[in-house]
Amino acid sequence: GGLPYAAFLAPGLLAAQGMQSAAFESTYPIMARIAWTRVYAAMLATPIGVRDIVVGQLAWIGVRLLLTTSVFFGTMVAFRSPVAALAVGAATLTGLAFAAPIMAFTATQRNDQSFNALFRFGITPLFLFSGTFFPVEQLPAVLQAVAWLTPTYHGVALARDLALGVATVPGVLVHLSVLVGVIGAGLAAALVTFRRALVV
């Protein structure tokens, strides 16, 4: 009578998909608007400022994440927990926890050559080793500690707990605190790096 693997896997994939979508949305499209098409520079010729651009871009990524994770969640009809739909919010927050700091990083780059390394050595290992496919408790102790520090782990755990109806208030608060903290730090960094990239 253990948990079916599909029930374990699906919420983890939901959160991990949010991470992957956000990572893409925060790299090439942002680089294009900063350096290739200079859309952001054109926007600064209007009454809006850098803060409006950064917050607006992050909000738009959030809307896209909400839509894509909602579609993915539609395939998870087997979850009957009354709070299972909140897993969509967890996946969206997971994505935003990557979008904000990656946007900040992208604004420091002169070209897209570093993005392959970001995906290969950052996003892919996080996708594989943050609890999406198997419990992080199966990792060596050092890697467990590393996993627990990542927003992916907290997003996956939060989405899974909500989807399965086993979330506890302390657990939810810990996971939310990490995700919101990373979003806030990433947003603060993005405001600085975007200003440096866009204001000459």
Model-derived features: where do they sit?
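Long, hydrophobic alpha-helical segments
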Residues: 7-27
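Short coil/turn motifs that cap or connect alpha-helices
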Residues: 49-50, 135
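Membrane-interfacial helix-loop-helix junctions in multi-pass membrane proteins
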Residues: 127-185
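Transmembrane helix boundary and interhelical loop/hinge segments in multi-pass membrane proteins
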Residues: 21-46
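Alpha-helical transmembrane segments and their short interhelical loops
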Residues: 50-120, 169-191
